[in-house]
From Swiss-Prot:
UniProt cross-references to PANTHER family, sorted A to Z: LEUCINE-RICH REPEAT AND FIBRONECTIN TYPE-III DOMAIN-CONTAINING PROTEIN 2 (PTHR45842:SF6), SYNAPTIC ADHESION-LIKE MOLECULE SALM (PTHR45842)
UniProt topological domain (Cytoplasmic) ranges: 556-789
Span of domain LRRCT: 242-288
Localization: Membrane; Synapse; Postsynaptic cell membrane
Domain LRRNT: 21-52
Ig-like domain: residues covered: 289-375
Motif PDZ-binding, residue range(s) on this chain: 786-789
Keywords: Cell membrane, Disulfide bond, Glycoprotein, Immunoglobulin domain, Leucine-rich repeat, Membrane, Postsynaptic cell membrane, Repeat, Signal, Synapse, Transmembrane, Transmembrane helix
Family, per entry: Belongs to the LRFN family.
Positions with biased composition (Gly residues): 407-416
Name of the protein: Leucine-rich repeat and fibronectin type-III domain-containing protein 2
Fibronectin type-III domain location: 421-518
Pro residues bias spans: 583-599, 641-650
């Protein structure tokens, strides 16, 4: 019973597995094979639930991008795999490792950029590989390694291939069809198709091939069907669309009998564009090589690099080879390199390289040769036990006066006692951090020196540095040294040895020295600190200067503010009444019954005292004439008298303009009073006019003279007048004067300027006689002169 149940369970599981099919796919179970068909189903990846026993799997026409190792794992029975017309751009290495039974792989019409060494690994039985219409730019040399002997059909057309692994193609002995059309191939290695005896179709259409290598396989392209055998089928060969270079190298191809005539010549210029099969055989010619440029002689120091150049032209382009002086062909090695342009580089020269190198340029039409003479300047070598050179066959033993020294015990026949140490022939002086001056001397009996060699090395390493110095120099400055380091330096002389016809060398002397230590970081820091300090000092000086300047301006401003009010408010006490014409009488001389005269209260601005000498004299004459007329008329008018004051500094422009404005205002007021005189006073006015002419200054009216001195018209400036008490003035004008010509002082309660009186409607038209009488009645202290500033 248990056996029956187990059998039923196994049958059910097998039936379920067989019936399992990926979504959107069609699974066909034909006899022993299982086919899974998923073409054009819009798949983005390989379905993971594909039956692993599938024999045929079609996934073409989808949108699969990536192939991973899990997609086809354990599908050992898969024979046909189609991945055409997808967007595959990457195949993970070893993705087909389990497909050991696969016969056909279609990867056409995808986006593969290249095929790596492990991309197709595991396809040991592959026969058909279709990879056309991709973006292949390169194929690894080992990409086809697993199926070289089984592959029958290889399609790599419509890609971007510049080359192929031709060695792998040569070993595909079972290859029947090879499609390489529509690529960028420009070269096919010679002998590539020699072993492809089963090749029936070769397509090289639309590439960049200029020539084809001669191969017997192409002779089968003209064989008839009668001569063909199963092991040597007729070859279908297509190579149209290539820019063939029609010269003697393609003459073998021209001699083949072919029916098609689609191939054309791309060069040379005389045959360009002509049909290949229509060109006569005698027109396929070549030009022998011609060497146009090469190195003639080269002198190289032993151990240094040497470059030999050789250029040649010809049709076809010649290949250049080099032959060493010992008749061996020079190739690429660790010491030499030969380039395609004909240049030979010797990285490290030796004494064996001395001689004539031969440049050989050869092509199908012939060859040309050129000689290059190379001379190697040999260098002395230092022994391991001492830093001095040991030339065993040197004959320059007397190059210095003390060079005949013993090499030390152990010498055969050396019974002579050791001599004293030689004098120093090499001196090192003027040692700095990076340079030193080396001087040496040679005895007069020494042979003629060809040149000197200076060699030195740092005590920390064993690398020697050489300097070649002309024989005329006995001193040399060694530069580019390391600071704070010890150096071992030797000077050697080189001359021509007539016995051996070689260059002989001998040591002149050696010396040791140490370069001075340098501290670039400390010096750099010191210079930075010094620069910053200078900037700070200069900035501090500028700031201090600005502060001092500001303080001086502030002090000057404060002093000016304190002095200005005191100057403008200075009172003039020596101003007396305009009616007495003299000094004020003392209290004892005052008339009886008169009240005591108080101190003068009149304050006069500085501008009224700063008159010129001419104006003062004119004012004095006017005052004297006015005084005479006033006494005759009984009005008791006193002249304006300004006592001389102490010499003052030169008045400013504002003060001078104020004085001129006051004089102008005074004259205008007098004219107005004369015009407004009443008929009752015409007689007095006539008398006054007569005296007015006497008081008038000789230079003209004061108003005209003041206007002529002012830079601007007076109408544009503010006009000021004498301030007086309105009520007292009116009372004085109406009541007359006190007998004796003296009026007691009155309090000036309301002081109005002319402008204020004019604005307020209180300016009264007084006559000049009344105004003069009022001035005589009032004391001088009742008049206040305002500044015009």
């Amino acid at each position: 019973m248990e056996t029956l149940l187990g059998g039923l369970l196994a049958f059910g599981m097998a039936f379920a597995v067989v019936d399992a099919c990926p979504k959107y796919c069609v699974c066909q179970n034909l006899s022993e094979s299982l086919g899974t068909l998923c073409p054009s189903k819009g798949l983005l990846f390989v379905p993971p639930d594909i039956d692993r026993r599938t024999v045929e799997l079609r996934l073409g026409g989808n949108f699969i991008i990536h192939i991973s190792r899990q997609d086809f794992a354990n599908m050992t029975g898969l024979v046909d795999l189609t991945l055409s017309r997808n967007t595959i751009s990457h195949i993970q290495p070893f993705s087909f490792l389990d497909l050991e039974s696969l016969r056909s792989l279609h990867l056409d019409s995808n986006r593969l950029p290249s095929l790596g060494e492990d991309t197709l690994r595991g396809l040991v039985n592959l026969q058909h590989l279709i990879v056309n219409n991709n973006q292949l730019g390169g194929i690894a040399d080992e990409a086809f390694e697993d199926f070289l002997l089984t592959l029958e059909d290889l399609d790599l057309s419509y890609n971007n291939l510049h080359g192929l692994p031709w060695d792998s193609v040569r070993r595909m002995v079972n290859l029947h069809q090879l499609s390489l059309d529509h690529n960028l191939l420009d070269h096919i290695a010679e002998g590539t198709f020699a072993d492809l005896q089963k090749l029936a179709r070769l397509d090289l259409t639309s590439n960049r091939l200029q020539k084809l290598p001669p191969d017997p396989i192409f002779a089968r392209s003209q064989a008839s069907a009668l001569t063909a055998t199963p092991f040597a089928p007729p070859l279908s060969f297509s190579f149209g669309g290539n820019p063939l270079h029609c010269n003697c190298e393609l003459l073998w191809l021209r001699r083949l009998e072919r029916d098609d005539d689609l191939e054309t010549c791309g060069s040379p210029g005389g045959l360009k564009g002509r049909y290949f099969w229509h060109v006569r055989e005698e027109e396929f010619v070549c030009e022998p090589p011609l060497i146009t440029q090469h190195t003639h002689k080269l002198l190289v120091l032993e151990g240094q690099a040497a470059t030999l150049k050789c250029k040649a032209i010809g049709d076809p382009s010649p290949l250049i080879h080099w032959v060493a002086p010992d008749d061996r062909l020079v190739g690429n090695s660790s010491r030499t390199a030969v380039y395609d342009n004909g240049t030979l580089d010797i990285f490290i020269t030796t004494s064996q390289d001395s001689g004539a190198f031969t440049c050989i340029a050869a092509n199908a039409a012939g060859e040309a040769t050129a000689m290059v003479e190379v001379s190697i300047v040999q260098l002395p070598h230092l022994s391991n036990s001492t830093s001095r050179t040991a030339p065993p066959k040197s004959r320059l033993s007397d190059i210095t006066g003390s060079s005949k020294t013993s090499r030390g015990g152990g010498g055969s026949g050396g019974g002579e006692p050791p001599k004293s140490p030689p004098e120093r022939a090499v001196l090192v002086s003027e040692v700095t951090t990076t340079s030193a001056l080396v001087k040496w001397s040679v005895s007069k009996s020494a042979p003629r020196v060809k040149m000197y060699q200076l060699q030195y090395n740092c005590s920390d390493d064993e690398v020697l540095i050489y300097r070649m110095i002309p024989a005329s120099n006995k001193a040399f400055v060694v530069n580019n040294l390391v600071s704070g380091t010890g150096y071992d330096l030797c000077v050697l002389a080189m001359w021509d040895d007539t016995a051996t016809t070689l260059t002989a060398t001998n040591i002149v002397g050696c010396a040791q020295f140490f370069t001075k230590a340098d501290y670039p970081q400390c010096q750099s820091m010191h210079s930075q600190i010094l620069g910053g300090t200078m900037i700070l000092v200069i900035g501090g000086i500028i700031v201090a200067t600005l502060l001092v300047f500001i303080v001086i301006l502030m002090v000057r401003y404060k002093v000016c503010n304190h002095e200005a009010p005191s100057k403008m408010a200075a009172a003039v006490s020596n101003v007396y009444s305009q009616t007495n014409g003299a000094q004020p009488p003392p209290p004892s001389s005052a008339p009886a019954g008169a009240p005591p005269q108080g101190p003068p209260k009149v304050v006069v601005r500085n501008e009224l005292l700063d008159f010129t000498a001419s104006l003062a004299r004119a004012s004095d004459s006017s005052s004297s004439s006015s005084l005479g007329s006033g006494e005759a008329a009984g009005l008791g008018r006193a002249p304006w008298r300004i006592p001389p004051s102490a010499p003052r500094p030169k008045p400013s422009l504002d003060r001078l303009m104020g004085a001129f404005a006051s004089l102008d205002l005074k004259s205008q007021r007098k004219e107005e009073l004369l015009d407004s005189r009443t008929p009752a006073g015409r007689g007095a006015g006539t008398s006054a006019r007569g005296h007015h002419s006497d008081r008038e200054p000789l230079l003209g009216p004061p108003a005209a003279r003041a206007r002529s001195l002012l830079p601007l018209p007076l109408e544009g400036k503010a006009k000021r007048s004498h301030s007086f008490d309105m009520g007292d003035f009116a009372a004085a004008a109406a009541g007359g004067v006190v007998p004796g010509g003296y009026s007691p002082p009155r309090k000036v309660s309301n002081i109005w300027t002319k402008r204020s009186l004019s604005v307020n409607g209180m300016l009264l038209p007084f006559e000049e006689s009344d105004l003069v009488g009022a001035r005589g009645t009032f004391g001088s202290s009742e008049w206040v002169m305002e500044s015009t500033v």
